[in-house]
Amino acid sequence: MKVEYYKEYSPCLERDMEYKVYGHAGTPILVFPSQNGRFFDFENNGMVATVEDLIDNGNIQLFCCDSIDLETWSEEGGHDVGSRSHMLEQYYHYIVDELVPRIIDINAMCGTHAKGIYTTGCSLGASHAANFLFRRPDIFSGCIALSGYYDSDLFFHEYVDDNVYRNSPIKYIEGMSYDHPYVEMYRKCRIVL
């Protein structure tokens, strides 16, 4: 199995971010680590081995990213809530504006162009996976979210600002009109929650 490690500077997060890529071709799947996890956890917990045949056959290509959960969702002590919510949105922009273009470029090296990126994760990783698909169904075409929690109240309690709202699928989907263009896009996505 082809495995590549990347460490690249993120202007959005003002730090180096790490990720690993497993496979040479196939549907790109963006893997979010579970709560407070790291990019290597999916492999270390045996999850890469469970789909090794799909990777080796070129059916899927995994992109295991890092999280900043300790500064956002899980950080309830040191940082003020406004800083935490700001970093939620910075992480969103890191994924969408910086990592997704890299995923597209790396995946295209096999000579084909994916028709969308899937997301997956467990625990808080599932929450990220679902949030990114629901926020950007124009980029993400499927999601497998295992044991996620899709509201911000568990981590932010009663606090809600624009950033928290935009990262809480329960809140923004409930507030979405039935004729919003994303509703039709959701119907075309493969979603497992």
Q: What is the role of each PLM region?
A:
Residues 1-193:
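Non-catalytic cap/lid and distal C-terminal segments of serine-dependent acyl enzymes
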